[in-house]
Amino acid sequence: MAAEHDSDSVEPPGSEALLDAVLRTLYDLGETEGETEQKRIRKKKAKKRDSETIEDVAVEPLPLPGSPVRGQKKSASSFFQKLREELQSAPAAPSEVPVTTAVSLSPPKNGSKLVEVVEFQSKSKKRKLKSDEDEPAKNKTKVVKKDVDIQEFNLEKARLEVHRFGITGYGKGKERVLERERAIMLGAKPPKNTYVNYKVLQKQIKEKKIAVEEEKRAARETDIFKKKKKKGRGQEDRRSKKSAPSILSSGQVGQVGKFRNGTLILSPTDIKKINSSRVAK
């Protein structure tokens, strides 16, 4: 008993506060009067000591349950070890759990901290990928549209050049009128109509009608004159054909009938002449 009392007296002064803190975390013992201020101080001290003990455990591996402990800290470390054995009385081995904690809490060798690598994919990259995929289709449509526009522009330009070249064949007065019509066709505003008095307008209409009628009469007269000429020529041709004796049917040569396309054609008069000549003989 005396040895046990001596070992308790050797314990460090902060062991009682640590024991109280551990017991209060495990069991709800309730609060007494005047403990509020002391409790705060004890909690701060307990947190500092717990952090120190955890760092010691992380740096130095925990000893096995049968191994001896260093000098003065023998009683406190043995007490904590017993508590852990009681709390962690599970089917798993008790020595394996602290080793894992030690490994997890052990800092890296060169004093460098472990850094988590996070890959961040921004929306702009996704949009760029989609735009890169859509670019060839857009380029194709643009090329097709450009080709169509070029063809249409060339056709319009050619049409205007042909129209301009056709105007040059007329006189200056008509050329100006045609140029004005071309400008109106391209979208220019036509000139305003000139206002004329009603009586003057009636005279102009009558003059136009008279001019049209005269042109029609002249055309008719020319047509009649041409027809008369054609008729006279036709009658003269017929008379010349009848009056001109055929070389083959002339009595001087002694040939009867006419040749057409290599065949001899005899008229009924020719046949009668032949028959009468035979009877006379």
From Swiss-Prot:
Residues 29-141, 221-254 are annotated as: Disordered. The modification N6-acetyllysine is found at residue 172. It is found in: Chromosome; Nucleus, Nucleolus. The modification Phosphoserine is found at residues 67, 75, 267. InterPro entries: FSAF1-like, SSU_Processome_Comp. GO terms for cellular component: chromosome; nucleolus; small-subunit processome. Keywords: Acetylation, Chromosome, Nucleus, Phosphoprotein. The keyword Repeat does not apply. Coiled coil: none annotated. GO terms for biological process: ribosomal small subunit biogenesis. The keyword Manganese does not apply. Part of the small subunit (SSU) processome, composed of more than 70 proteins and the RNA chaperone small nucleolar RNA (snoRNA) U3. Part of the small subunit (SSU) processome, first precursor of the small eukaryotic ribosomal subunit. During the assembly of the SSU processome in the nucleolus, many ribosome biogenesis factors, an RNA chaperone and ribosomal proteins associate with the nascent pre-rRNA and work in concert to generate RNA folding, modifications, rearrangements and cleavage as well as targeted degradation of pre-ribosomal RNA by the RNA exosome. Prevents helicase DHX37 to be recruited before post-A1 state. This is 40S small subunit processome assembly factor 1. It comes from Mus musculus.
